[in-house]
C-alpha cells in the first residue's frame, strides 16, 4: 500500500501538474503526467482523462510551474555534436520534443549511466524555466541489444542463461530498479517509456519501408541489413567516414553473416537456434537489431521530428550514427535538430567495469549512509560534456554541503517565494553550466548582505533546475540531557586544553549521531 505521507501529498496537489510513477500488475513501472483532478484522476496534455490507483504509486512529484517574472528571458543553448557549435533549443510552437536513449535492462544502471539520465532531466527543467513545454520520450531496451551483428548474442538472454531466470522477468526486475533510481535522484518522469518488445509492429514496418526505399536488403543469410553506402552523409555525426572504416571497426571481424559490406548493420536477425524473445516477420521468425528501435520509436512518438536527442558519448558511434541514417532515410529529412552527448564518468580515476570490480550503484551510495541526492549534487559540480572523476570523498563532501544548505533554508522559515537571479539563469541556459550555478549558490550562501529570506528565495529558484530538494526540511531531534552533558563536558575539556578528552567526547557524540565543529565562535553541532 502507498504510505499515508504519499497519499497526503497527492491529495494536497489537486489542480497542479504532476508526474506519478505507478507499478503495473506485471511489476513494471510507468509514469502518468498531467493536471491532477482528484486523488485518482488527472488530465494529460491531449485532454485525455487518465485514471490511476494511488495504492500503486511509488513516487510522486509536482512539476515546477514558473511565474512569468521568474522565467529567464534567455533561451537554452546546447553543444550540438553534429555541428560542433552551440545551438539554441527552441522547438516548435513553444514545445520541445526530446528523445533520450534509455537503459538496456539486463543489470542495474551504474552511476555513469545515471549521469546521462540526469542530463535529460536538467535539460527538461531548464527548458521549463525558459517557458517552454517539454515532451520527453525515453526507450527501454528489453530486447535486441546484441553484442554484435554476427552471433546475435542478446544481453538480456545472456543474463537469463547465466541466472536461469526468464528473460522478460529479468527485464522487468531491472526496469523497476531503473525507475526506483530515477525517483531517488529526483529525476522527473518522461512522458513515455516505450519498451522495445512492445514496439515490434513499428520496427517491422520501418524495416519494410527501408527495403522499399532501397536503404536495406535481405542478406544471403536471410537477415535484413541496412545498406550503409545508400546514405551519403554517413559519418557526419561521429566523424567516422565509410571509406575509412575497416573490417572489425566495431567488433572482432568474422566472415560469417550475409552482409554486402562490412559496415552494414542488422535491422532484423533470423532466429536460427534461438528460441526465446523471437517474433514473426515477413522475413521469418527473428528479432530486431539494436539501432532500429530508436528510429521507430522516436518517429512514431514524436511525430517524425526530434528537437533534441540526448545520450551518452559511448552511443555516438555506432548507435547514433546508425540511428541517424535509418531515421533520415525513413523521413527524407534531417530528423534530429540537435544531438547532445554526455561524457564518460570515471570512479576514483578508473573506468567502471564489472571485470574490474569497481562498478558503483546508487544503492552502494545509500548503503554508506549518504543521501542519494549527494550523487546528483556531485554530478552537478561538473559540466555534462566534460569527463568527470567521481570519488567517495566528493560524494561525502556533497552530502555534507547538502545538509548544510537544507539547514540554511529550514532556519529561514517555510516560505515558498522564488526570487529570480540573472547569473543563475545565465549559467543554466548557457550549455548547462552547472558548475557556475553551484559557485553562484555558494557565493549567495556566504554573502552577508543578503538576508535569510532572500537567500531562501534564491536557493529555491536555483533548485527548480538543480533538483536537490533543498526545501525538504531537516529532521528535528531533541538533545537529550545525556547528550547535552557530553556537549558541555567537551566545552570544558577544550577550555582546559584537554585535547585527548575533547577528542574522546567528539567520538562519543559522533556515535550518537551528532557532528561537531569547532570555529572562532566556539563549538557547534548538527545532526548527521
Where are these regions (language model features)?
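Conserved RNA-binding domains used in RNP assembly and mRNA/RNA metabolism
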Residues: 1-74
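N-terminal alpha-helical targeting/anchoring segments
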Residues: 39-42, 47, 123-127, 443-447
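N-terminal, positively charged nucleic-acid-binding surface of large information/translation enzymes
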Residues: 91-186, 525
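Short, glycine/charge-rich beta-strand/loop segments that flank catalytic centers
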Residues: 137-145, 174-178, 188-203, 221-229
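Structural preference for alpha-helix termini/caps and helix-kink/transition segments
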Residues: 351-354, 358-528
Amino acid at each position: 500500500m502507498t504510505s499515508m505521507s504519499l497519499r497526503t501529498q497527492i491529495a494536497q496537489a489537486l489542480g497542479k501538474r504532476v508526474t506519478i510513477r505507478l507499478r503495473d500488475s506485471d511489476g513494471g513501472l510507468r509514469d502518468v503526467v498531467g493536471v491532477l483532478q482528484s486523488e485518482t484522476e488527472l488530465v494529460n496534455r491531449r485532454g485525455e482523462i487518465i485514471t490511476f490507483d494511488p495504492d500503486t504509486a511509488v513516487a510522486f512529484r509536482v512539476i515546477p510551474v514558473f511565474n512569468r517574472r521568474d522565467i529567464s528571458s534567455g533561451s537554452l543553448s546546447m553543444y550540438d555534436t553534429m555541428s560542433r557549435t552551440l545551438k539554441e533549443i527552441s522547438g516548435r510552437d513553444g514545445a520541445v520534443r526530446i528523445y533520450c536513449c534509455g537503459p538496456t535492462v539486463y543489470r542495474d544502471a551504474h552511476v555513469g549511466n545515471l549521469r546521462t539520465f540526469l542530463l535529460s532531466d536538467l535539460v527538461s527543467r531548464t527548458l521549463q524555466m525558459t517557458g517552454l513545454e517539454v515532451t520527453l520520450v525515453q526507450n527501454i531496451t528489453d530486447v535486441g541489444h546484441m553484442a554484435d551483428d554476427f552471433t546475435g548474442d542478446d544481453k538480456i538472454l545472456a543474463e537469463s542463461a547465466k541466472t536461469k531466470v526468464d528473460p522478460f522477468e529479468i527485464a522487468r526486475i531491472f526496469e523497476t530498479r531503473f525507475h526506483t533510481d530515477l525517483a531517488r535522484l529526483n529525476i522527473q518522469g518522461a512522458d513515455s517509456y516505450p519498451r522495445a518488445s512492445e514496439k515490434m509492429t513499428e520496427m517491422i514496418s520501418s524495416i519494410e519501408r527501408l527495403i522499399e526505399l532501397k536503404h536495406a536488403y535481405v542478406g544471403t543469410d536471410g537477415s535484413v541489413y541496412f545498406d550503409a553506402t545508400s546514405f551519403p552523409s554517413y559519418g557526419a555525426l561521429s566523424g567516422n567516414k565509410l571509406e575509412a572504416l575497416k573490417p572489425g571497426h566495431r567488433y572482432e571481424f568474422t566472415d560469417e553473416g550475409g552482409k554486402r559490406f562490412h559496415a552494414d548493420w542488422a535491422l532484423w536477425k533470423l532466429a536460427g537456434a534461438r528460441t526465446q524473445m523471437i517474433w514473426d516477420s515477413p522475413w521469418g521468425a527473428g528479432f530486431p537489431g539494436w539501432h532500429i528501435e530508436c528510429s521507430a520509436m522516436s518517429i512514431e512518438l514524436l511525430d517524425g521530428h526530434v528537437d533534441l536527442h540526448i545520450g551518452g558519448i559511448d552511443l555516438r558511434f555506432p548507435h547514433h550514427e546508425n540511428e541517424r541514417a535509418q531515421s533520415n532515410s525513413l523521413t527524407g529529412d534531417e530528423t534530429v535538430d540537435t544531438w547532445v552527448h554526455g561524457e564518460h564518468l570515471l570512479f576514483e580515476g578508473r573506468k567502471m567495469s564489472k571485470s574490474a570490480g569497481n562498478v558503483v550503484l546508487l544503492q552502494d551510495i545509500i548503503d554508506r549512509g549518504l543521501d542519494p541526492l549527494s550523487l546528483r549534487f556531485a554530478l552537478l559540480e561538473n559540466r555534462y560534456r566534460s569527463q568527470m572523476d567521481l570519488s567517495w570523498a566528493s560524494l561525502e563532501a556533497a552530502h555534507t554541503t547538502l545538509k548544510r544548505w537544507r539547514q540554511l533554508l529550514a532556519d529561514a522559515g517555510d516560505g515558498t517565494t522564488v526570487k529570480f537571479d540573472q547569473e543563475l539563469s545565465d549559467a543554466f541556459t548557457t550549455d548547462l553550466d552547472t558548475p557556475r550555478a553551484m559557485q553562484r549558490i555558494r557565493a549567495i550562501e556566504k554573502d552577508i548582505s543578503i538576508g535569510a529570506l532572500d537567500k531562501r528565495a534564491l536557493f529555491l529558484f536555483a533548485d527548480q533546475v538543480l533538483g536537490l530538494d533543498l526545501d525538504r526540511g531537516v529532521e528535528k531531534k531533541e538533545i537529550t540531557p545525556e547528550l547535552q552533558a557530553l556537549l558541555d563536558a567537551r566545552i570544558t575539556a577544550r577550555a582546559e586544553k584537554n585535547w585527548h578528552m575533547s577528542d574522546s567526547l567528539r567520538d562519543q557524540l559522533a556515535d550518537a549521531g551528532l557532528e561537531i565543529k569547532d570555529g572562532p565562535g566556539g563549538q557547534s553541532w548538527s545532526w548527521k
